[in-house]
């Protein structure tokens, strides 16, 4: 038995973390059961910092408990395992982690900015900084620690340092600024080195949100960098940002905005004729402890001429990313590129579906204006990212497909889930969901890569389990939780968007919306269930408790524009009839038309349901952590809200006798009804589906729940709904050429045509394909429940999930009256296999086949 897939805090060989007692993790590649492990950690010189010795246990993780670690410490580590025969396996390959800069005293650098006066109404060219670094001695190692309020790109002698795109990533820069650590040992040379940095507006000062509001976090972009060179004689040279750095803003990038694009004069060269100006920020940078945003897949276009006479490039896949191109040209020749997700009725590129137009601004522009230099021009976008499948190019230059690429840009999340079936449309839907996850994982989970690009908490919470089946989402999600809790108010309220920049007064009133702000409890809860990580509950418990208290305070209260519920006594005491809320959100237009005015008034049905459910989760968390008094309080309110919901369900305004599927799915999913109501709701849901032609009538919150609910009592109904190819329905999207998941069931026809074609939320159905259709569920540490449920017209389905405990696979194939099952359980885990009409069986690692 050998340890594989070594990770530190869910990261591969992280450089510059700020966790001084990190958890070291691994998987087992063979054998049945791990009975013991040994972890040895050593420093740069090979001195042992920690040796666990042979430690009994099957846990595939150990928390570092060796000599205290300090800033800049490098630790290499390896693992040896003992199997069920007590035989010792080979040592694993070595892994490593390095501590970053832990405190303010470690930072000798000063914040610098461009040397010009700022008018927040103006836009400015990209700042260019330069520092000459002389090296005379032999180096042992060198590290660059760098961050910005804005976006930076750093180069050494013209070569980009690292592969991070859009660094330093997105946070609420008023609360937390994350820095990166780069190993530049091999990039430096003896003699003269030129360190150059470009600094752009980014999220800090650039366009943010649907309306493209600027200066959300500040209006002065700034840079902080510290280069530490350790020589072989033990001495360290430190080069820091200060007012000796050269500066100018006369370089090639004349304008750069995340959403709107870049204006580039390729013939310009920065003069660095001025000096940087000192400034301050008042926050000690923090390590990101997250995977970087990097370039991934590349696509070359099919080039045609659009009806409007401009060149039209079809890259074949809707992505979040940017372009690279090269061609020969004369100085001053100009090309203009626009990017979008769709074509209009005439066959020209349109941005209608992604733009919000106000009197002040149209955004996003998703545009590049490029003026050529003489000779060979080589360009790649630096400080913008777009959502697009198509590009429209206005130019008289010849464009060659092989010299143009669309580059997908997203966080370096590793795909862990794969699915295939006998239905090609369903397989395409899963692929589209994978692409929407990629396109909306850019340091934070976003709603779309075009119009808003916000970290909407509702999207994140409903999609978390699907994302975690499809990708290693652990480090990414932990970083996002930091963003969520960075904004928490003193009363416990959590934001609807994280990081939150304070969009406007109206949007501010929506913070605390159930289904959205509940992310602060639901992601840690589900993280614990999927990753077996109780530490995340410990880390956030007090803050989760604070949000739970905020929910409790709303019980029994009436809010602005609240309607009378017609209930009294205990039910009235626990009903939630206060607080603004998005409600179900985005139900099909013919089921419940969207009306922005709905958000002004409370949604007592949705709010009471979610308060009961979330406080129930919180009670379970408190119990497992040993907070029994808290658990009793949370359970009391959860049960109180449940009974209030049952009372409300007897009233005309909230009756279960409805064709609104969400009103039936939600209480069934959250177990809110009494026995009589439950049986009625089950039958009424089937009737509602029949009345709607077996199409999806749910909205944002209930769509991920409906198949789970149906499969519990009518599997045929679940499959009938899944296989529906008409609108509204999941398969309608791939049937109509979607390569990513749409925001609205109606696609581009919804909400007056404003609807993103890359919104992952409706792809949350993929969770059910893994845990329902193929039956893969994590059930505690090192244990799975495998309970596949064949059905519908499917003859075959297979899912594999590379979980934190190892890769598990489940497939089934029907042939006449027989169904063949194949199930693979990873080393050092067990599983309970539950097959139709067959007694449950508990198994250890191995592959198991059945024919039933």
Please report, for each region that a protein language model flagged, where it lies by residue.
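Extracellular/oxidizing-compartment recognition motifs
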Residues: 1-451, 459, 475-476, 495-508, ...
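Acidic/polar loop patches that form or flank catalytic/metal-binding clefts of enzymes
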Residues: 90, 205-207, 236-240, 337, ...
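Alpha-helical support elements that line or immediately flank enzyme active sites
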Residues: 142-146, 322-341, 391-394, 458-488, ...
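Active-site acid/base region of carbohydrate-active enzymes
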Residues: 151, 242-244, 248, 398-432, ...
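Active/binding-pocket-proximal capping segment
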Residues: 152, 160-163, 167-168, 484, ...
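C-terminal capping/lid segments that line or modulate ligand- or cofactor-binding pockets
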Residues: 195, 452, 470, 520-521, ...
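Non-catalytic C-terminal accessory modules of carbohydrate-active enzymes
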Residues: 219-226, 239-271, 277, 285-296, ...
């Amino acid at each position: 038995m050998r340890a594989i897939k070594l990770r530190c805090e869910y990261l591969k060989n992280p450089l510059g973390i700020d966790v001084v007692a990190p958890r070291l993790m691994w998987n087992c590649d063979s054998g049945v059961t791990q009975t013991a492990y040994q972890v040895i950690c050593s420093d740069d010189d090979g001195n042992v910092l920690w040796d666990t010795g042979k430690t009994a246990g099957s846990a595939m993780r150990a928390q570092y408990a060796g000599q205290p670690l300090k800033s800049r410490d490098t630790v290499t580590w390896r693992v040896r395992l003992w199997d069920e025969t007590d035989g010792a396996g080979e040592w694993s390959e070595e892994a490593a982690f390095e501590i970053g800069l832990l405190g303010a005293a470690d930072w000798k650098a000063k914040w610098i900015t461009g040397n010009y006066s700022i008018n927040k109404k103006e836009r400015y060219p990209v700042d260019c900084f330069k520092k000459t670094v002389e090296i005379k001695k032999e180096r042992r190692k060198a590290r660059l620690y760098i961050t910005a309020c804005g976006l930076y790109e750093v180069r050494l002698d013209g070569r980009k340092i690292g592969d991070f795109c859009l660094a330093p990533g997105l946070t609420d820069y008023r609360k937390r600024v994350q820095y990166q650590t780069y190993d530049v040992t091999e990039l430096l040379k003896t003699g003269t080195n030129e360190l150059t940095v470009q600094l752009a507006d980014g999220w800090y000062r650039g366009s943010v949100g649907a309306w493209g509001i600027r200066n959300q976090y500040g209006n002065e972009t700034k840079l902080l960098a510290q280069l530490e060179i350790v020589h072989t004689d033990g001495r360290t040279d430190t080069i820091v940002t200060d007012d000796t750095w050269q500066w100018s803003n006369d370089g090639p990038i004349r304008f750069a905005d995340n959403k709107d694009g870049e204006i580039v004069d390729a013939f310009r060269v920065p003069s660095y004729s001025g000096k940087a100006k000192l400034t301050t920020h008042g926050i000690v940078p923090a390590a990101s402890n997250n995977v970087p945003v990097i370039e991934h897949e590349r696509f070359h276009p099919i080039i045609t001429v659009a009806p409007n006479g401009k060149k039209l490039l079809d890259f074949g896949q809707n992505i979040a990313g940017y372009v690279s191109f090269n061609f020969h040209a004369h100085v001053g020749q100009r090309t203009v590129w626009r990017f979008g997700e769709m074509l209009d009725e005439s066959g020209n590129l349109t941005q209608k579906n992604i733009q919000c137009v106000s009197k002040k601004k149209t955004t996003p522009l998703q545009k590049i204006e490029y003026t050529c230099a003489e000779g060979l021009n080589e360009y790649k976008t630096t400080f913008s990212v777009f959502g697009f499948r198509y590009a429209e190019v206005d130019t008289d230059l010849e464009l060659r497909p092989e010299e143009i690429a669309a580059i997908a840009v997203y966080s370096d999340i590793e795909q862990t889930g794969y699915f295939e079936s006998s239905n090609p449309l369903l397989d395409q839907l899963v692929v589209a969901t994978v692409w929407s996850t990629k396109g909306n994982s850019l340091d934070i989970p976003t709603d779309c890569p075009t119009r808003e690009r916000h970290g909407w908490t509702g999207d994140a919470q409903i999609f978390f389990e699907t994302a975690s089946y499809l990708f290693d989402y652990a480090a990414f999600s932990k970083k996002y939780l930091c963003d969520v809790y960075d904004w928490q108010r003193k009363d416990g309220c959590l934001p609807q968007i994280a990081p939150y920049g304070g969009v406007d007064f109206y949007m501010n009133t929506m913070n605390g919306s159930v289904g959205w702000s509940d992310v602060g409890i639901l992601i840690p809860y589900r993280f614990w269930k999927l990753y077996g990580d109780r530490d995340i509950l410990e880390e956030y418990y007090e803050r989760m408790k604070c949000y739970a208290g905020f929910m409790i305070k709303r019980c029994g209260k009436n809010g602005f524009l609240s309607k009378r519920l017609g209930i009294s006594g205990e039910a009235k005491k626990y009903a939630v009839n206060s607080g603004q809320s998005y409600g179900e959100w985005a139900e099909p237009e013919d089921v419940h038309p969207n009306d922005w005015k709905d958000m002004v008034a409370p949604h007592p049905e949705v709010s009471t349901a979610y308060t009961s459910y979330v406080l129930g989760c919180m009670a379970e968390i408190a119990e497992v952590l040993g907070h029994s008094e808290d658990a009793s309080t949370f359970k009391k309110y959860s049960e109180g809200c449940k009974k209030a919901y049952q009372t409300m369900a007897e009233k005309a305004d909230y009756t279960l006798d409805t064709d609104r599927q969400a009103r039936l799915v939600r209480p069934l999913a959250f177990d809110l009804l009494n026995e009589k109501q439950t049986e009625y709701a089950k039958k009424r849901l089937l009737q509602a589906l029949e009345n709607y032609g077996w199409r999806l009538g749910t909205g944002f919150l209930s769509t991920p729940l409906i198949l789970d609910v149906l499969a519990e009592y009518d599997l045929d109904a679940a499959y009938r709904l899944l296989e529906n190819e008409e609108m509204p329905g999941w398969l309608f999207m791939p049937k109509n050429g979607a390569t990513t998941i749409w925001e609205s069931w109606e696609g581009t026809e919804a909400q007056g045509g404003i609807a993103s074609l890359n919104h992952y939320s409706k792809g949350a159905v993929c969770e059910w394909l893994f845990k329902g259709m193929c039956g893969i569920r994590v059930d505690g540490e090192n244990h799975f429940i495998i309970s596949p449920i064949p059905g519908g017209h499917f003859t075959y389905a297979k899912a594999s999930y590379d979980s934190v405990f190892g890769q598990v696979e489940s497939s089934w194939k029907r042939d006449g009256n027989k169904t063949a099952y194949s199930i693979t359980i990873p080393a050092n885990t067990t599983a309970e296999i539950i097959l139709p009409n067959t007694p449950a069986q508990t198994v250890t690692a191995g592959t198991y086949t059945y024919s039933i």
